[in-house]
Amino acid sequence: MRDFQRLTQALADILVGSPVPQAREVRLVLAAARVLHGERSDTVALDFKLQRRGLQALADRIRAEDLGGLVPYADQITPEMLAKRRQGIAQMLLGALAERRFEGLINDVTGGGVLRIEDHRPSRTDTDYRLLNGNGNPICRFNVKFHGSLFREARRHVGLPPEDCFPLATYKINQALRRQEQEKLPYVFLVLSVPDLSATDVGRPIPDDYVWALAVLRGRMVVEEAIVARLLRDDHLPLFRPLFNRMPEGQFRVISAKKADRLLREMLFERVHALSLKGFTRKFRNAEVDMHFSLTQELTPARTFLELLVQESPQRFAVRLYIGDY
């Protein structure tokens, strides 16, 4: 049962000190491991809220077939699948590191009093944070974007230097504006730009067993989130600290959904490269149709944004966000 033991050991390390996720696949692995170690199936089934008969049958299959008794496709995992899972973990880890930097910036600018942020990441929606005033009333919502990979041909195709070019999917701009209109709360994209820091760079130190376990469990979001949380703990964090140190607050910039939409309409054919390519969707099947913005000219530094907010009345500032001044 070498492969099944590898999976249980990886999960045990990922989940050390954390509650067991509610994902059924994870509970089945951990429960079967306990039965295979000699515990009574009825007791274990009760602990994991599983059917005793089904759990015992699963343990018997694993004993006979190793990991194939749990996931018949386990021997079909390819290097391409592993690379995809590693990339997904890395992208989520980059987002988590960016959010930590932003929390520090907010506290630095406001002293933790005039403004505060409300964490909405656990809700898994398009809102990462809401910015609240001193009375707890929302001023705007933030959607955090990490930008590292450069568009090398940006100058030729959209008229911007590669290091100053930020792509944002056009459908995300549309969704953000619709959300703003529905809830009457300004929607703001918070962008952390670190040129030439890509998910590939971040993915290299991720333990192979973590990546493999995620692939075996079909990329379950709760497992991916647990891996990221584990990598941010003290024993793993030193591996990623050099990357974390490349995220100075000066690289944080913001753009409201309204301003992004206005610029999209004004420069549709100049900045949406996909519209100038015949058969774009056929040539780049999984590519998004992006609008490209100038980081330095069209986005506002986050520190400037927060300082202006502290100086102005929150109500007036919210109106300016709503109409696209920033």
Predicted regions and their residues:
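Conserved catalytic cores of phosphodiester-cleaving nucleases, focusing on short active-site segments
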Residues: 102, 106, 127-156
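Short N-terminal edge-element motif at the start of the domain
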Residues: 81-128, 133
